[in-house]
């Protein structure tokens, strides 16, 4: 059952973790020069079925010091234990504090590619042709 949908509890806890991580990143308390003045969006958090691992999908909205998006994710993973300790204050009701793993969110990039494909002249021509045939 690897492709099973997440439970209601996984979704609820994931959303709580997402808010807590986003709040920590928004405060700018990380002592990493790369992350200090950067805007990072926490797009989604997926919880493991036992709620012990939280995979945080992030999207850096601005990069400084000519850093790549992968560098930002690596820096977040390096500071994941500190972030875990900071979010523990707002998630006291949890029996176990989840291990945080940061991943790059590519959904916006995928959206841009699909949007560019739909706007291409070939697709527009086919759509226009299908509209005429349907009439």
Curated annotation (Swiss-Prot):
One of several proteins that assist in the late maturation steps of the functional core of the 30S ribosomal subunit. Associates with free 30S ribosomal subunits (but not with 30S subunits that are part of 70S ribosomes or polysomes). Required for efficient processing of 16S rRNA. May interact with the 5'-terminal helix region of 16S rRNA. Belongs to the RbfA family. One of its GO terms (biological process) is maturation of SSU-rRNA. The keyword Transferase does not apply. Monomer. Binds 30S ribosomal subunits, but not 50S ribosomal subunits or 70S ribosomes. Its main location: cytoplasm. It comes from Bartonella henselae (strain ATCC 49882 / DSM 28221 / CCUG 30454 / Houston 1) (Rochalimaea henselae). Keywords: Cytoplasm, Ribosome biogenesis. It comes from the Bacteria. GO terms for molecular function: ribosomal small subunit binding. It is found in: Cytoplasm. The keyword Magnesium does not apply. PROSITE patterns: RBFA. This is Ribosome-binding factor A. Pfam families: RBFA. GO terms for cellular component: cytosol.
